[in-house]
A protein has these predicted regions:
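Secretory targeting and sorting signals
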Residues: 1-31, 60, 193
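Gly/Pro-rich cap/lid or specificity-loop segments adjacent to the active site
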Residues: 32-305, 360-362, 366-505
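Short loop/turn hinge sites at secondary-structure boundaries
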Residues: 158, 317, 326-337, 345, ...
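Flexible "cap/lid" loop of the alpha/beta hydrolase fold
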Residues: 237-255, 324-327, 335-348
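Structural motif
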Residues: 293-309, 315-319, 348-356
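Short helix-capping/linker segments at secondary-structure and domain boundaries
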Residues: 314-328, 332, 368-373
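Short, mixed-charge aromatic SLiMs
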Residues: 330-343, 348-349, 383-391, 497-501
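Long, low-complexity segments enriched in small/aliphatic residues
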Residues: 332-366, 370-374
């Protein structure tokens, strides 16, 4: 996953982060000594949004290394919004994806579930190890995503070497985080979830995962299948492809989706005046990108920032208007400030926590190719088919070439013992291509898949599509899934939310 704007995914419910509180817990690891958790000491949250929602906050203390539970400890930031019904359906843990996304504010997510179905759960938001308000939080080089960086496409040997040096420098800087880097695998976070279950005094958990959070759910439910009561996985990672192949697949999908976006911009040429066909808009976009390499907009928005801004159009429909306005404002009026605002919103210059955790997890979940020649050959081959995102995505992952922590082996995902799961995906999702959801459906025989043909939005459940959200509500309320159909296709179909219509049209 690359630069998912978690803030945008949940903007409809205005979640946010810090907390106040204290204390402890931690538990059993898979094939590791037992660690008995203590209850979390709940207190007041620092976040106004969490306080307004009636949330409590605290810290969960867990082993740095579950193989040595008596050793060093780290603390996970946790929030809770309690059930308001007479009968509780237990706890619902939520992860927004990333890896590296903060989930602390997501204890308010239950309020977005229709039919009051979320009210019978205790919703648990948490920052995974190394993330956000958890302690310690990873950071390697806060200025890594500063403005006007070297161009992504390495069309000269010098540019290629510049990016390889930048990536190696970042990985080297990450070594200062010490032993935490050796314990940032998805399996570590799955064990943290098991610690959280025990600290909350629950025999089972319910789980809601988005994007990378689906993979965390897959790993947890493979390691602890009897501990899963109900599970919703929205936009599924294909566990066969973690993580090198998954990123190459993303490149092809994002190129398809940006063309869909350019077609939409052209449809409203009377509003934006950027071209009357998708091809014309695309040509103009690449022309502007080349010119920004020589004269960055406002001195800050160069070709990389330009790419990063519009990457969000491949993730979600609901930012399309703002991006088109900024595109048009720059082309026709030289107004660069809306571009900078969009970039800052997605990438938060001066804060590399998300990126540090992203690499710490993905670089150690599995072994990446150690030979740069393979990366070069594979990425150039994909670039010639899909130029929009390929080299940006490649450089986002190249710290894995020299990551200062050992890689492990990915878990073989097996959902045969899991009681049930609701899978959701839009069929043109670029960040987690739809084949991943089909594969997970195969691996979880008791699951059902809701598909949205033609939809391009990533992680879109509980965002206002009544067809999807009502089925989520029914599952959470009763445990009933859409009837599973023969074969390996979707079990239920919903229309995606319609494309936005510009106000001026």
């Amino acid at each position: 996953m690359k630069r998912t704007n978690v803030k945008k995914v949940f903007s409809a419910i205005a979640v946010a982060g810090l907390l106040a509180g204290t204390v402890a817990a931690a538990p059993v690891a898979v094939a590791a000594p037992e660690f008995t958790p203590a209850p979390i000491a709940w207190g007041s949250c620092n976040s106004p949004n969490l306080r307004k929602a009636g949330a409590e906050c605290g810290f969960l203390e867990v082993p740095l290394d579950y193989g040595n539970p008596g050793g060093a400890k780290i603390s996970l930031a946790v929030s809770r919004v309690r059930h308001t019904t007479t009968r509780s359906q237990g706890v619902m843990l939520v992860n927004p994806g990333g890896p590296g996304g903060s989930g602390l504010g997501l204890s308010v997510l239950g309020k977005a579930v229709p039919k009051h179905a979320g009210e019978s759960y205790d919703w648990i938001g948490f920052d995974p190890r190394g993330v956000g308000s958890s302690k310690p939080a990873l950071s390697c080089d806060p200025g890594y995503f500063g403005y006007n960086r070297p161009a992504y496409v390495p069309d000269t040997p010098r540019l290629e070497q510049t990016w390889l040096a930048r990536s190696k420098s970042y990985a080297t800087a990450c070594a200062k985080n010490g032993p935490l880097l050796e314990h940032m695998k998805t399996t570590d976070s799955a064990q943290d979830m098991e610690s959280l279950r025990k600290a909350l005094g629950q025999q089972q958990i319910n789980y809601y995962g988005f994007s990378y959070g689906t993979y965390l759910g897959q790993v947890y439910s493979t390691l602890y299948p009897q501990r899963v009561r109900r599970m919703v996985l929205d936009s599924n990672v294909d566990p066969r492809k973690v993580w090198y192949k998954a990123n190459l697949d993303q490149d092809l999908a994002f190129d398809r989706n940006i063309k869909i976006y350019f077609d939409w911009v052209a449809k409203y040429d009377s509003v934006y005046h950027l071209g009357s066909s998708g091809d014309a808009v695309e040509d103009l976009w690449y022309t502007e990108q080349k010119e920004l390499a020589h004269a960055p907009a406002g001195g800050v928005i160069g070709p990389d920032e330009w790419n990063d801004i519009f990457l969000q159009a491949g993730y979600y429909r609901f930012g399309w208007e703002d991006m088109a306005k900024a595109f048009s404002g720059w082309v026709h009026g030289g107004d660069w400030k809306p571009l900078k605002a969009l970039y800052d919103d997605a990438d938060s210059p001066g804060d590399d926590n998300n990126f540090a955790v992203y690499n710490a997890v993905q670089c150690t979940d599995t072994q990446w190719p150690a030979n740069w020649t393979k990366w070069r050959i594979d990425n150039w081959a994909v670039y010639h088919r899909a130029p929009f995102e390929t080299w940006s995505n490649a450089w986002y992952n190249t710290p894995c070439l020299s990551w200062p922590a050992k890689a492990g082996k990915p878990v073989t995902i097996d959902g045969r013992k899991v009681a049930g799961a609701l899978l959701i995906d839009e069929e043109l999702d670029a960040a987690t291509p739809f084949g991943g959801s089909l594969q997970v459906r195969t691996l979880y025989p008791a699951s059902s898949l809701i598909a949205e043909p033609g939809g391009t939005t990533h992680a879109d459940s509980l965002s206002g599509d009544a067809c999807v959200d009502d089925q989520v509500a029914d599952y959470l309320a009763t445990g009933k899934l859409p009837a599973r159909k023969p074969g390996n296709g979707p079990d239920a179909i919903c229309a995606p939310l319609p494309d936005p219509v510009p106000a001026q049209s």
